[in-house]
Regions:
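Short beta-strand segments within Ig-like beta-sandwich modules, predominantly Fibronectin type-III
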Residues: 51-58
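Short beta-strand elements bearing conserved aromatic residues within extracellular beta-rich modules
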Residues: 43-46
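Extracellular/virion structural assembly segments
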Residues: 90-221
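Non-cytosolic beta-sheet module surface loops
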Residues: 36-38, 65, 159
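Pro/Thr/Ser/Gly-rich low-complexity, intrinsically disordered linker/stalk tracts
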Residues: 2-40, 79-106
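Exposed aromatic-hydrophobic patches
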Residues: 60-66, 156-157
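Beta-strand-rich modules
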Residues: 1-3, 63-83
Length: 221
């Protein structure tokens, strides 16, 4: 037999002693260019919309994988202490006037202004997996909606010289970020590229499908 005391309560104070102030500056455009005042910190955590996306040691970071209105913050941290400093949040808009492709493995932007037609056409496909089951006692099928979705961009562009052709062909099988003027962004792999050439230029078409990509980093690693 044993006797148990009532549950007790204890206050566990958590005290943060911040270091120097961090002043964050962010510039929008095709990508987000971040810079901040350096301090005596060992490393910095970069947050986009509340999610830690990068751990860096230099007082700057470029985020190519964002679109639209974005909110950034930077946290200065120490290796041997849990103390930190947090910058004020900065909001910017990231976008593009033309279809832009970013080779995330080579760190290179590709800029294609032209299409084979007078007006560029870019196709966006969205789908949600819905299964229909015919059950006894129901006149119409019952819909079962799963969590699976797909999102893909169909891109067509023109290359007028060999350097552009080689850059585009090099995207095959590379993790690629595609942004459009309509505010769409897809990150995935071009699995196939179709090329048609004449005496003047080469026309390329391909599809990039959104992959399940975890951006949040492990801040303890």
């Amino acid at each position: 037999y044993g006797f148990w005391s009532p549950w007790g309560t204890a206050a566990l104070p958590v005290v943060n002693v911040p270091g120097g102030a961090i002043t964050l500056t962010a510039e929008g455009g095709i990508e987000a260019a971040l810079s901040w005042t350096p301090g005596s910190f060992d490393y910095y955590l970069v947050y986009r919309n509340g999610v830690a996306i990068a751990k860096v040691t230099e007082p700057s970071h470029t985020d190519a994988a964002s679109i639209g209105g974005v909110r950034y913050q930077v946290r200065g941290c120490y290796d041997n202490s849990d103390n930190y400093s947090l910058s004020e949040a900065v909001e910017i808009t990231v976008g593009t006037d033309n279809v832009r492709l970013y080779d995330m493995e080579r760190g290179e932007w590709l800029h294609f202004l032209y299409d084979s037609s007078a007006h560029r056409s870019t196709g966006l496909s969205l789908s949600q997996d819905i299964q229909y089951v015919q059950l006894s006692g129901h006149t119409y099928p019952v819909a079962e909606r799963s969590e699976f979705k797909s999102r893909a961009l169909r891109i067509a562009c023109v290359c007028a010289d060999d350097a552009e052709r080689q850059s585009l062909r090099a995207l095959l099988g590379h993790l690629t970020c595609c942004k459009t003027p309509e505010g769409n962004m897809i990150i995935g792999y071009p699995a196939s590229i179709t090329e048609n050439s004449d005496d003047f230029f080469s026309t390329y078409s391909f599809t990039i499908e959104q992959i399940d990509r975890k951006e949040e980093i492990n801040i303890d690693s």
